[in-house]
């Protein structure tokens, strides 16, 4: 489904991703963790070509992402992305935010787009907010709208780039609950997060990155109880003892 082979990424002279080899299968939940500046977000953003790779090969859903001739919009239709900041249009209602892309990009009729939007608002637990504006919602509610918006395009893959890091502690749980439910339903998910409880409970595999490299890959029970890499041990001791 997602295949990185010897992927490198530079910003000028700065080597952000170093020889990345990673395969993510359909229906798998992969959580990427590591210290700030380790390249986690860049890696995820390469999947839908928000960032371009400098060398190597990246194949997503049988499409060579680094091929200049591909229809990038076609690729992105199959990939939902949820960022740290919700990026909702402030002048549109929740419903309008969710129906915009399906109507414009997929040419779905308005009635059907609204029904789909309501279905996903129900799924994320806020159907009563359909006619509210983003400014009337809490951060957690806005992030759940952003997830519903991503799902309304019926993607094959969902990418989450630190989806809870801008939220108040009391609203983090409601967003993680939605993500847990998605994982249970078999959505292919790539998640960058500092929420170790979520990673332990939901991930099929943990990918630990540091300084642009993947240092360790393991199932969560193995990674959290017995990490092999010294750098991973230090990271976990710092993050789990706070």
Swiss-Prot record:
ATP binds at residues 34-41. SMART domains: AAA (SM00382). This is Glutamine transport ATP-binding protein GlnQ. Residues 2-236 form the ABC transporter domain. It is a peripheral membrane protein. Part of the binding-protein-dependent transport system for glutamine. Probably responsible for energy coupling to the transport system. It holds the Pfam family ABC_tran. One of its GO terms (molecular function) is ABC-type amino acid transporter activity. Belongs to the ABC transporter superfamily. Induction: By lack of glutamine. GO terms for cellular component: plasma membrane. Keywords: Amino-acid transport, ATP-binding, Cell membrane, Membrane, Nucleotide-binding, Transport. Its main location: membrane. Coiled coil: none annotated. It is found in: Cell membrane. It comes from the Bacteria. The gene is glnQ.
